[in-house]
Amino acid sequence: MKRKTSPILSWLLTIGFAFIAFIAVFPLLNLILASFRPSTELMRNGITLIFDPSTLTLDNFIYIFTEAGLYWTWFGNSVWISIVIVVLSLLFSSMVGYALAVYDFKGRNFFFLLVLIILMIPFEILMLPLFQLMIKLQLVNTYTAVILPAIVAPIAVFFFRQYALGLPKELMDAARIDGCTEYGIFFKIMLPLMGPSLAAMAILQGLNSWNNFLWPLVVLRSNDMFTLPIGLATLLTPYGNNYDILLAGSVMTIVPIVILFIFFQRYFIAGLTVGGVKG
């Protein structure tokens, strides 16, 4: 028999969850409201929810859309880099994860252990040898230097490997009997079955590449090649800070990710749920 929950307990839980949700949403709400305030108001009262509503203006966003040409250059750079990283990462990481899950070859467990070890190492530790490698390859100040280290992500390999463990091997055997090659089995049969995991990892990889600040800052030199996070950081200088433009630009940076998640949240949740219980 199902036990009824006390009304008082339900109210307490609701209030508690509402308070936690408010704490989580508060910084974002503060950012959005501050982006509509002029620089003088921000300098006088700071970024706070207590302000004069009559000071709200669209001038910050109008400036970005009409005069901040370099902002859209940075925006385009981030979009292009994120798309390339997502496509290549999904392709190569899914192939590696699939191979580690399906094929029995010598050293398979060692390679999987290596993936787990790399997954636990902070990127800052690997950054110096990676940068030295980019110097030797003469890739500094190129988008290739930004994209190359993200092509095979350990977290994506682990995720796809766990998901591929639950794929029906009977389909592989049937395809081999019909004369299908191993590449054909992967691209025509298994990869479509990995759709939910691909959608989930596309959002995660896209979010990581979109917000990536440290590595592009290390390898990029030209101002017109900067990604959006680095470009926005250049608005903060010792000689003056354009907080109003910075806040409006930050809000515009969030919009593509929010739209992406709204349209793909069903696949994202399904991919994480199924991928988390495979194997």
Curated annotation (Swiss-Prot):
Q: Does the keyword Chaperone apply?
A: no
- What are the TM regions of this chain, as residue ranges? 8-28, 79-99, 110-130, 140-160, 184-204, 245-265
Q: Which InterPro entries match?
A: MetI-like, MetI-like_sf
* Top-level taxon of the source organism: Bacteria
Show the GO cellular component annotation of the record.
Answer: plasma membrane
* Entry membrane topology: Multi-pass membrane protein
Q: Which UniProt keywords apply?
A: Cell membrane, Membrane, Sugar transport, Transmembrane, Transmembrane helix, Transport
Localisation: Cell membrane
Q: Which GO terms describe its biological process?
A: transmembrane transport
Note the Pfam families from the entry: BPD_transp_1
Q: Has UniProt tagged this entry with the keyword Protease?
A: no
Q: Specify the ABC transmembrane type-1 domain's residue ranges.
A: 75-264
Membership in a protein family: Belongs to the binding-protein-dependent transport system permease family. MalFG subfamily.
The entry's function note states:
Part of the ABC transporter complex AraNPQ involved in the uptake of arabinooligosaccharides. Responsible for the translocation of the substrate across the membrane.
Q: How does it assemble?
A: The complex is composed of two ATP-binding proteins (MsmX), two transmembrane proteins (AraP and AraQ) and a solute-binding protein (AraN).
Official protein name in the record: Arabinooligosaccharides transport system permease protein AraQ
State the organism named in the record: Halalkalibacterium halodurans (strain ATCC BAA-125 / DSM 18197 / FERM 7344 / JCM 9153 / C-125)
> What is the gene called?
araQ
